């Protein structure tokens, strides 16, 4: 409902959008101040040039389709919807990060999650990122998106700064 008294705030929108990427990253509130400038500066994507998919666990949601089928289906459905609605999207940027609350929650809720070789709680970029790249390639390659993987790591002992490393994942 609009305010008829003239106090309605009005915000700018893009009349047409032709995004070139979908960027999947974590909703952890501690890290939002790092994600936004990383996407703009290092990925070269301004608002309207990408579709943000912000979910707990970020790209990690793609890592375990057998153990977390509902979460995987949610992400797969989003990629398919985006592909249909925005054929201009050519890139899928998948971001994971150190000290993920989502991973800790899974370790507490799913027995064996931390001890199972396929789904250990991981802290090195290549580990889960290779798995995510392989799953993306196996289940979503038909969309024709170029996958780019990044891992956020804390850059100081206070955990107040984050750096993002490009991960060259190995898929089998």
Describe every region a protein language model picked out.
Residues 1-35, 56-77, 81-87, 101-172:
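Divalent-metal-activated hydrolytic enzyme cores
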Residues 17, 46-47:
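A short, structural micro-pattern
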Residues 36-43:
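Short Gly/aromatic-enriched secondary-structure transition segments
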Residues 43-45, 85:
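Short glycine/proline-enriched loop/turn "hinge" motifs that connect secondary-structure elements
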Residues 49, 88-91:
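Loop/turn elements at helix/coil->beta-strand transitions in domains of secreted/extracellular proteins
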Residues 49-56:
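Short, contiguous, well-structured surface segments enriched in hydrophobic/aromatic residues
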Residues 91-99:
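Histidine-centered catalytic micro-motifs
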